[in-house]
Amino acid sequence: MFKKSSSRRRELLLNIAVAMSALGAIYAVSNRIIKHNGALLNLPPRVEAVADWETYGLEGHRMGPSNALVTIVNFSDFTCPFCQTQAPVLRTVRRQFAGQVAVVFRHQPSQRNEVGRQAAIAVECAARAEAFEPYHDLLFRHMDSLGTKSWTSIAHEAGVADTTAFRTCMGDPTIRDAVDRDVAAASELGAVVTPTLLINNIKALGYTDLDSLSMFVRAALESRSVSQ
């Protein structure tokens, strides 16, 4: 009798332990999902209006028509996962509003992360070889290996023919100055997080999903049509 009772007790304790372990695993996974999706996909960006917005699109790398009705200035960091996720959203919006939207990429590398700064310098050097966009895409694709993968090998992959000139460019102080100007502009704008988007006069702090960004673009287009 005692043996049966003891056996049942051990079985019950084992079942409780297994159940608690399973619940703990479910909680851990769901908590990661909530944190990831909540921060990255579901929470809306903080939005503010900017008076002198047009000046922020005068520098940087423009992807789209020069006469676009809507300019999205993207302050970004190649070591930022949220920026990595923002990039295809911006590409989709350019396709959706073809001829009406241009994206201007500007740098905002973390001051504590030298890899991000080196990535910014590298893509500036790729831009000298007319390879900004492919290099930009490859940096985000290879984010996990940035700092270990050679900047020159990425340049070769991006189609930069003269890799010797590319390596020389990496030490050019004028390239560093260009990155510094972007960082200063981001600070002036109050871009306290990456990415920060400026959709004409609307500043969106943080990742902006496709639906929200499309809404901002439509509002900007309507504002343009009313003012004309």
Positions of PLM-derived features:
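Cysteine-centric redox/oxidoreductase cores and disulfide-bonded domains
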Residues: 7-11, 28, 35-36, 109-228
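Extracytoplasmic thiol/disulfide redox context detector
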Residues: 2-112, 171, 177-193, 219-228
